[in-house]
Amino acid sequence: MSSAKKKPSLVTCPQCNAVVLTKDSLRHQDFCGKPVVESEIACAQNGTLRGFNVAVDKAEGFLPPDAVGWEKEHSILINQQTMESLGLLARQPVRIIHSSDSFIGIVWPCKEVALLKVSIISSRIARERMITLESCGRVEKLKSLSVTVKTSLTLNPALSGFLEAYLSHSYLQYNSSVDLKYLGQNVTVTPEEPIESKMSAMGIDDDKKRNSKVVSTAVGYKIQILNASAEGSTSDVLQTLPTDLSNIGGCFTAKQVLEDYVISPVRQKESPCSVLIWGLPGSGKTLLLKEVALVLSGSTTYIGSCEELMELNGVTTGNIVIVDVNELEKENTKANRALSFLLGDEKKCVILCVRSSETLDIGFRVRFPIEAEITVPTQDERLDILSKIGNIYNFPLELHLDVARHTHGFTGGDLCSLLKAAKFARGRTHLERVNDARKRIRPTGIRQFILEVPNVSWNDIGGNEELKLEIQQAVIWPQKHPEAFERFGIDPPAGILLYGPPGCSKTLIARALASEAKMNFLAVKGPELFSKWVGDSEKAIRDLFSRARQVAPTIVFFDEIDAVGSSRGSEKSSGVSDRVLAQLLTELDGLEKSSRVILLAATNRPDQLDSALLRPGRLDRAIYVGLPCEVTRRAILEMRTKKMKFDDTVRTIDKLVEKTSGYSGAELVAVCRTAAMFAMRESIDATIVQWTHFEQALAAVVSRTEAYLLEIYDDFKAGRASNA
């Protein structure tokens, strides 16, 4: 190993005292004696640096933990050795110059930055661009800062308070703008020099001196907005602010909570409560919280993202802090620390808004004494929302009630999308265009489930007239004639069980029922609810009924309910199925008549259901959907053969009805389809289905309903225990 000392990385030119990299010492001879700004290589001289702006991975992690607002956005990382060459100290203000642009920042040491280079946190200057960094000299402290603001937002005291917090401990130069984000929108702030300062600085180099003058905001300074430019035009700074939350449509419960626990206490000079608010996207959370910020203007600080929360780091001006974030991840330690700091300040009221309360750490949740969920709007809330947005889209007032009735599951955002789409939809009238647009919009409230208003009518189900009437009495009558039930002092059924052989239209009946009743239809199959993760199956049941209540009136259809509701202690049951059944029973007990949620279940094996599920108050009615009788078979066959041509239509249908005794509805449909396939097999151009084709189809499709199943249904109907 050589004993020679390693050459220093930086060398000082003996002629001009410029500091350059050792490898650039020869190239420096071409620029020796010239101003630093003309150098094409990195160098430092007399407090001025000429070097490249480079990228540093996770640069914000090298900043001091209390760097927030302007200080964070305008920090400049620089090597400690480079700082010593320039005679700079940490957090000292410097001017960055690139082309015709210049701005003020503060330096902070970082060993990851190469010698004679800088890493500017702001994206104002692109990476790998040559910049000039120079010290600012004397800085004037200001107790009052006058600015002009350019933004598309309404200027109000809330924004003024945010700017005061953001520009705290900042270094600025007059007529040089600062760009920032507020409520997700761009805001450009330009410091304006007082007229007295302009007059005192008048001289030969007036403009140059004023533009290079650096000022700093003192502790407790005040900001004054001179004028506001909104979308390029000048307007009054402060506009009329709302006094309550009546401008926001819907959200009745959440609005009342905020009025009672936040707004009223503030006006009465009392301490407000911290509130946790959550709800689906498009439900109006952000709109509501922005309105709260306007109502309590001057007392609030609005934080619209985790990034803003981390920037402010708990430093806010108002005593009401609104934190509007979609999700607060546990891994985001800096945001969690900032929120914890806010909640730990007894003088502050925190309104936290998230998408789901379940994802919030329990340590935070217990610190909110009041919680409010913004649910999917009810009919009255939808009507209120339409009254607020109808004028925007020129939607007639007389149609508001009709639209509100038929938009179950629509959030406020969905209703806006509906009226917007209706302007371009097909139809001669407003209502026709709205109905066309509604088919194209999937409501937010029902997206995560298979939920819809099915396009199936009673006419699509052949025969079964008595069965249809019985089901209508159990489901549709309570919706259309509630006064009749009140007159007799009885409650409508909470649940209905459809049982019978496979293929007898139980699912089709359920869909037609939802369509005729104009109710949402939420369909799940029993096995789909099971999960290998402990507790997930029970949570699926809870979520199912929770969403059903939100988008009521709803029919919750459980197909193959025997997979979930099998008798406890039987061979089919297991630990998971028993827990799921217990959760299902709990949810059924919690269904109040005012919830407008009906459980409709279907099974082929009613004998295997747990007796607790079948008691009155849960599955009140058990309706047998049996094999089609002669009249029903005729109706089904006539419906399925409408487009078929026969040699003798009447005789063919009569023969089919006679020969399909014991066939289910699905098997009758299969017979018709198979006969048509045999006709096409003989000739692809065939137009008539012969009786011989039906004979072949009857031989291929046979009745598969076993006799022991029919005995089970008879025993169940009579209340006898089955031996099967």
UniProtKB/Swiss-Prot annotation:
Binding site for ATP 1: P281, G282, S283, G284, K285, T286, L287
Keyword Nucleotide-binding included in the entry's annotation: yes
Biological-process GO terms, alphabetical: cell division; ribosomal large subunit biogenesis
Description of the deletion phenotype: RNAi-mediated knockdown causes embryonic lethality. The first embryonic cell divisions have mitotic spindle and chromosome segregation defects, and mitotic progression is significantly delayed. At late telophase/G1, air-2 accumulates at the spindle midbody abnormally persisting following cleavage furrow ingression and into the next mitotic cycle. Loss of inhibition of air-2 kinase activity. Also, causes defects in ER dynamics characterized by a failure of the ER to form a sheet structure at the onset of mitosis and remains in large aggregates throughout mitosis.
Gene Ontology molecular function terms on file: ATP binding; ATP hydrolysis activity; protein kinase binding; protein kinase inhibitor activity
Known EC number: 3.6.4.10
Gene3D superfamilies xref list: 1.10.8.60, P-loop containing nucleotide triphosphate hydrolases
Pfam families (alphabetical): AAA (PF00004), AAA_lid_3 (PF17862)
Subcellular location: Cytoplasm
CC terms in the record's Gene Ontology section: cytoplasm
Catalytic activity annotation: ATP + H2O = ADP + phosphate + H(+)
Keyword match Metal-binding: no
This protein's UniProt keywords: ATP-binding, Cell cycle, Cell division, Chaperone, Cytoplasm, Hydrolase, Mitosis, Nucleotide-binding
InterPro entries reported for this sequence: AAA+_ATPase (IPR003593), AAA_ATPase_domain (IPR050168), AAA_lid_3 (IPR041569), ATPase_AAA_core (IPR003959), ATPase_AAA_CS (IPR003960), P-loop_NTPase (IPR027417)
Residues spanning the membrane: none
Principal EC category: hydrolase
Residue numbers binding ATP 2: G503, C504, S505, K506, T507, L508
Family to which this protein belongs: Belongs to the AAA ATPase family. AFG2 subfamily.
Domain statement: The first ATP-binding region binds ATP with low affinity whereas the second ATP-binding region binds ATP with high affinity.
Protein role: ATP-dependent chaperone which uses the energy provided by ATP hydrolysis to generate mechanical force to disassemble protein complexes. Required for various steps of embryonic mitosis including centrosome duplication, spindle assembly, ER dynamics and cell cycle progression. Regulates the stability and activity of kinase air-2, a component of the chromosomal passenger complex (CPC). Inhibits air-2 kinase activity from metaphase to late telophase and negatively regulates air-2 stability during mitotic exit.
Subunit structure: Homohexamer; ATP binding induces oligomerization. Forms a ring-shaped particle of about 12 nm diameter, that displays 6-fold radial symmetry. Interacts (via N-terminus) with kinase air-2; the interaction is direct and inhibits air-2 kinase activity in an ATPase-dependent manner.
Name of the protein: ATPase family protein 2 homolog
Organism: Caenorhabditis elegans
Gene behind the chain: cdc-48.3
